Amino acid sequence: MENRTASVERVTKETKIRMTLNLDGTGKSDIHTGIGFFDHMLDGFARHGLFDLSVSVDGDLDVDGHHTLEDTGIVLGTAIREAVGDKQGIRRYGDRILPMDETLVLSAVDLCGRPYLSFQAEFTREKVGEMETEMVKEFFYAVSYAAQMNLHIKVLDGGNNHHIIEAMFKAFAKALDEATSFDPRIAGVLSTKGSL
């Protein structure tokens, strides 16, 4: 079977983004967003989801990081949707409760074709590195809507903002890896409607 891949480019007055995603990769990444902590998070997403991910972003960071994070989320969600394709034979659902020291984060995914985000988290710092913590929700909102997936992220325990955000990205990666994986018992798509 061929690898499920997508290449997406998005150009606006605020950002220029190129991304390639391979859902059937080995966790290789080449990430350049201009925000070091965001690069670190996307690298963790690729590595722990075993996705190959290449991201190049030229954003208006002289304003702030808002457009860079939001638009990267739109492009990642679009790449996920395109790479998943017709969803024949995939598990559709995935979830993970992931620990990182004092932090425990739940992520659950349904590749149902209906966009929805439930995000339950509180941060105690405005930024981690140069990344604004309030933009974490905006990033995942953009991913979920562009991918047309249900995405739940809930912090069950935690104190360190770096750990919380990192656990979110890794838990999402693990949940998405499960949801996009194949089950030989599934004929067609996993839906009583016959389509997703």
What are the roles of these predicted feature ranges?
Residues M1-L196:
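Structural preference for solvent-exposed beta-strand-turn elements
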